[in-house]
Amino acid sequence: MRIEGLWLRVLSEVMRKAVGMPLPLTHKDFDVKYVEALRELIRGSYVDKALLLAQDEVYDEEGKKMDFGSFHVPNDYLFKVCRENPEFVPAVSIHPGRKDALEELDRCLASGARALKLLPNCQNVNCSLPQYDEFWRRMAAAGLPFLCHTGGEMTVPVINRAYQDPRILRRPLELGVKVIAAHSSGNSHFFDQNYFGELIKLMDEFPNLYADTSALNSPIRSGVLKQVKESGRLGRFLHGSDYPVPVGAFWVRLRGLITTAQWREAGKIPNLIERDAFLKRAMGFDDAHFTRLDEVLRKV
């Protein structure tokens, strides 16, 4: 793990304290304690299982590893944690520019991968490059969905802001990949662009495009919640939490999406995963919103 810059250092500490982790990020037992804490949050929440995400390293278009990024969660570690904890479902991370990308994809499929996660703007992934076509085709053939970060990002370093636009997903969609646009393509800060309108245009064109509601109970991203609810396409939106991003009820109350009584009730829920689910149910998201992901994930 590498955290550079004052903003990321402050934010990482805010998130660590918000989720109740007593150990510093650099402590040798941090990973073990984090997994244990997350498992107990799942067990104590409305949610039965959680999609656990790996995080690949950053590569250039020639497949050379770049000295960029803040942390790396290997696929092997992901599979180990998921084997030991049935509450977790594995979403691997493979940069398609890696020299061994296809081999790693086949290996992860054989190991039971249910989805693949990337942050194109942070991991330098131009999804439109023709040299990645075979990677997308193999994902589509295997039924492995692509959970893709969309919109801005403030918790990890950004290498190319152009890749936060959901329109970069056109090529994987054309090749038949089921794509989940994380965060519903909303903006992450006041000066960031909201791409929700572009997301809806793509949804109208591609029935294999979905979006999730992860991190939408945060101060800025919550601004897209009303658009989601009024989109007329709720059947294409899936529940997500983006844990350990903190969850607050104040902003959705300020936007008129919940009542004062619901805001107070949410404040009594210390479990951030349960609080996030409670707020979405309070806003009117139905039971199917929380189970629809299982229909999209790869069957194993």
Predicted regions and their residues:
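An N-terminally biased module of ancient metal coordination in phosphate/nucleic-acid-related enzymes
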Residues: 1-53, 59, 63-69, 281-282, ...
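Active-site core of metal-dependent hydrolases
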Residues: 118-120, 149-158, 178-188, 208-216
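Active-site neighborhood of phospho(di)ester-bond hydrolases with catalytic His/Asp-centered motifs
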Residues: 53, 91-93, 117, 147, ...
